[in-house]
């Protein structure tokens, strides 16, 4: 069983579906309170995919015929559509988990010995079309959910759907209340988490259609792998003769543009070859894979001897730039290029 935890992501860069049983743990944690969720499955599914099932989680669907929420609780056999959002009320503390295994009429959350994958993680485009009825509060609402097991970019989703939407925004339901997520985000976030539901309000004369594509994913890059390994990181190799050390940088989606490169964290070396470590509040933290840095980050090199150091840059994603500030000179590194500089003893 593959488990994708609350802050995890699974971005499938291939056209081949993930096989086997996968659990997706929702980031929304509530107890005795409404939350808004949906499973990232490729096709219709039943609430038998919710773990724990039945008496532990109550769910209701949106009734498009009536333009209102259903008065009936969903049952273990109620069908949900791909990218459909539903209100859920957990009767326990913890997260709702969706499984590609259908537990069916059983209320057990334990996999049987012959458990099979009844549902497939969504790995393609999804188009949701409804004949929405104007509800009592006005507007033509659609209840949606992120159809991918990874973060969905609000701005990218709006880029393909804004012309049909009222207000050019989406509405999320977080911490028991509604909030607006738009290009100018009142919530300070541009992400719809995996399994998170949201609402859109269509213009009266617009086609009631919502389009999802994998290119709308927050961390989507069609040219590079997204697996959580060193290949995801920009790799900078420092060489000194036969000795070398690799330093990895990863993009942090929460960083702010315009970060002052001279204010970034610094990494020092205590040997002839640079060894990266942060100095934060006077504490040295050794860390090769650096995942929590701003868009711009500096690496200072410190050596115990005079030497010549070569900088080699690989795995640079499209649209990214890496520069070295050598004294007063700023050098833009190119993919696969080598920059040599003399490093004196000290920093």
Task: Name every feature range the model reports, one short phrase each.
Residues 44, 65-81, 85-347:
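Compositionally biased Ser/Thr/Gly- and acidic/asparagine-rich
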Residues 1-30:
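Extracellular beta-helix/beta-solenoid repeat scaffolds
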Residues 25-31, 39-44, 48-64:
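Conserved "landmark" site that anchors the functional core of diverse proteins
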